[in-house]
């Protein structure tokens, strides 16, 4: 009986009536198996009598398989290489605890359905480029507890569905820029226990926009790396490091973070506003550190914070922790003993912080060490109003002229509160003019100090000029306004602008000055300036203005003399450029003239050597036409002068310049040769005194000149 052969595509089969039971089983297996695709690593099913590749359910000898070979476990088999006969329908492959050292290119290329690959606890020191090619379904890749010294960035190509990557406990020394940008689909990244890690690039985590969990615990970190790119991060593990200080901005951009673990991190100080960026934080673990106190209202911006672990810290219970006791009572009223115990002073040692109240301490309101001062600036400049205290355990807020309360983290377009309490203006406008109040708060109360910010409008005429000043000076600030960015100083002068009216002398009562509007700005002082009152326990100093006017200049070296020097340089440059253009023009004219003269000289030199002169003796009565048409000279017969009516025939005119002398001599001999004695002809003596006319004819083809002598 013929047998049915099924391999990738249907072949002619026997009629159902003649088909045996094994053949029917093979047919059903083919119908319900995945179709073969070109290059896809399909399964070839053959009957017992036919040849072909191993069946799909075959399992490597060193491994154990289950669930129809979809789970292959090859742990603790001392494998030095990845087995080559892993079934193509494998979804879970465990190769842990072997001796594999190198993962070679295309090792798993045929495992298109593989979802979980475990290679941890091997001796892997090298992963070749393309080692994970052909794994479009891979979801989890475990490489922890190996010997990798670098992040195998190139090997992660084409892992479009990778969600989890485990690199924990490898001797990795550095994490370069864009180390994981080839796997933007990552949700969990474990980089814990990298005990030889020395460097993390600022752009190491760029591209991980979908990351939810990051483990950087026990990596000997001294500073928190840049995590700004992890905009969707929800859980961050930083335990087991050496983070002595937590600074403001350490968690910038982590607005989605819900859980932060900082246990056993040797944290001794947390600065004011350090957690302000963690708007979504729900759980914070600060246990087992070296914390003695926390800044006032550190947790106030964390509106979603529900669980805080503060145990096993040497808390010093004084006025600085009193706010924490109140916060714990409000946040976790049912369990105020969950979190921390006092370590000092001795009278409160062992008491829970949540049980403390104000009766245990004698507290005082904070002191402002550096209060804000009045400031005069020009529109468009930067400005700062400082308000500093002697301790970081206080909170600093600002009240603006329109009643808005500014805190650290409550950013506006141009105004923000820095972590040290400074109110920063990046670009002031006239509308910013007014009184600003600094409020410093601790558990005992608050202290306020006020200062006035005067913003002057820019005079377009003054701003457009080099110095930006009007007559009489004092306008240098206008032109230099564009060069000032951060700090300004107030400069006073007793000089009165021409045409300005003298101001009335001030009274003994100090009042803040009005906006600076002198002649340089093209405007006068307003009739009345808004008074600035200070209701503070530590009042801010007020600057008196005994002078006629005040204006601001930048602290940079942009002065009027510097601007004049710049004008001189520009003028000198223009003069040099003009001279260069004039010299170039004169040189061009001289070159053209020289060229023309040289051309004329060459033309004259060309015609000169080609000219020759022929002297022809012609008769006075000889017509011009006859003289030209004479072809040969007539011979003189007999004696000279015989036949006086006969005419003398001229010799033929030759053009040979080389025989010129010969022809002239012949003509002379023909005329005087008939009288050997040198006498005259038959005409008589009168004929001898009359010379025959001579014709000078130039040999040049261009010019012909005739002269009678």
From Swiss-Prot:
The LRRNT domain covers which part of the protein?
Answer: 50-88
GO molecular function term, any single one: signaling receptor binding
Q: Note the segments forming the LRR repeats.
A: 89-110, 113-134, 137-158, 161-182, 185-207, 210-231, 232-253, 256-277, 280-301
Which residue ranges does the record assign to the LRRCT domain? Answer: 313-365
What is the reported tissue distribution?
Answer: Mainly expressed in the brain. Widespread distribution in various brain regions (at protein level). Detected both embryonically and postnatally with stronger expression in postnatal stages.
Lineage top rank: taxon? Eukaryota
Question: Which residues does the annotated region (Disordered) include?
Answer: 496-552
> This chain belongs to which protein, by name?
Leucine-rich repeat-containing protein 4B
């Amino acid at each position: 009986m013929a047998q049915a052969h099924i391999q990738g595509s249907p072949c002619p089969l026997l009629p159902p009536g003649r088909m045996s039971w094994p053949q029917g089983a093979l047919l059903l297996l083919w119908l319900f198996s995945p179709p073969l695709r070109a290059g896809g690593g399909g399964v070839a099913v053959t009957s017992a009598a036919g040849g072909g590749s191993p069946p799909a359910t075959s399992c490597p000898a060193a491994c154990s398989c289950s669930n129809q070979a979809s789970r292959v476990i090859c742990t603790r088999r001392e494998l030095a290489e990845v087995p080559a006969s892993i079934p193509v329908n494998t979804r879970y492959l465990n190769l842990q605890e072997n001796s594999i050292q190198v993962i070679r290119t295309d090792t798993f290329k045929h495992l298109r359905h593989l979802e979980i690959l475990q290679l941890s606890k091997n001796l892997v020191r090298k992963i070749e480029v393309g080692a994970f090619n052909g794994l479009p379904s891979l979801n989890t890749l475990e490489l922890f507890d190996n010997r990798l010294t670098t992040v195998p960035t190139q090997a992660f190509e084409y892992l479009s569905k990778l969600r989890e990557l485990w690199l924990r406990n490898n001797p990795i020394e550095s994490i370069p820029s864009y180390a994981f940008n080839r796997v933007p689909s990552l949700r969990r990244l474990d980089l814990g226990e990298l005990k030889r890690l020395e460097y993390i690039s600022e752009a190491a985590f760029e591209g991980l926009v979908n990351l939810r969990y990051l483990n950087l615990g026990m990596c000997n970190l001294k500073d928190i790396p840049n995590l700004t790119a992890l905009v969707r991060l929800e859980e961050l593990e930083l335990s087991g490091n050496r983070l002595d200080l937590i600074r403001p901005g350490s968690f910038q951009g982590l607005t989605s973070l819900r859980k932060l673990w900082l246990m056993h991190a040797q944290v001794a100080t947390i600065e004011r506003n350090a957690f302000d960026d963690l708007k979504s934080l729900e759980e914070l673990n600060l246990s087992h550190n070296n914390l003695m106190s926390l800044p006032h209202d550190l947790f106030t911006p964390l509106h979603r914070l529900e669980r805080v672990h503060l145990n096993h810290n040497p808390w010093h219970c004084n006025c600085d922790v009193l706010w924490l006791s109140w916060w714990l009572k409000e946040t976790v009223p049912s369990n105020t003993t969950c979190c921390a115990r006092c370590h000092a002073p001795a009278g409160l040692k062992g008491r829970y912080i949540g049980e403390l109240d104000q009766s245990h301490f004698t507290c005082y309101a904070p002191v402002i060490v550096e209060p804000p001062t009045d400031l005069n600036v020009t529109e468009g400049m930067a400005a700062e109003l400082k308000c500093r205290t002697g301790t970081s355990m206080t909170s600093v807020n600002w009240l603006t002229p329109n009643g808005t309360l500014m805190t650290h983290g409550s950013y506006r377009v141009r105004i923000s509160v820095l972590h040290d309490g400074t109110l920063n203006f990046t670009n002031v406008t006239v509308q910013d003019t007014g009184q600003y109040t600094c409020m410093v708060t601790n558990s005992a109360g608050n202290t306020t100090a006020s200062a006035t910010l005067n913003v002057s409008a820019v005079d377009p005429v003054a701003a457009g000029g080099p110095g930006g000043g009007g007559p009489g000076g004092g306008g240098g600030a206008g032109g230099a306004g564009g060069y000032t960015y951060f700090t300004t100083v107030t400069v006073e002068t007793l000089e009165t602008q021409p045409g300005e009216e003298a101001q009335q002398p001030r009274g003994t009562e100090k009042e803040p000055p009005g906006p600076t509007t002198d002649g340089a700005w093209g405007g006068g002082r307003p009739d009345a300036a808004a008074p600035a009152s200070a209701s503070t326990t530590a009042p801010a100093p007020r600057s008196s203005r005994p002078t006629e006017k005040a204006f601001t200049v930048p602290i940079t070296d942009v002065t009027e003399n510097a601007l004049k020097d710049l004008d001189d340089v520009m003028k000198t440059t223009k003069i040099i450029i003009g001279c260069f253009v004039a010299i170039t023009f004169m040189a061009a004219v001289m070159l053209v003239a020289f060229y023309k003269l040289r051309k004329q000289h060459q033309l004259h030199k060309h015609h000169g050597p080609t000219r020759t002169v022929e002297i022809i003796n012609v008769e006075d009565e000889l017509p011009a036409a006859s003289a030209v048409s004479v072809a040969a000279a007539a011979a003189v017969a007999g004696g000279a002068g015989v036949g006086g009516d006969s005419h003398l025939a001229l010799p033929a005119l030759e053009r040979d310049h080389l025989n010129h002398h010969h022809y002239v001599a012949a003509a002379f001999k023909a005329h005087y040769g008939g009288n050997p004695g040198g006498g005259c002809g038959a005409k008589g003596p009168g004929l001898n005194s009359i010379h025959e006319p001579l014709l000078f004819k130039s040999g040049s083809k261009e010019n012909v000149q005739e002269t009678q002598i």
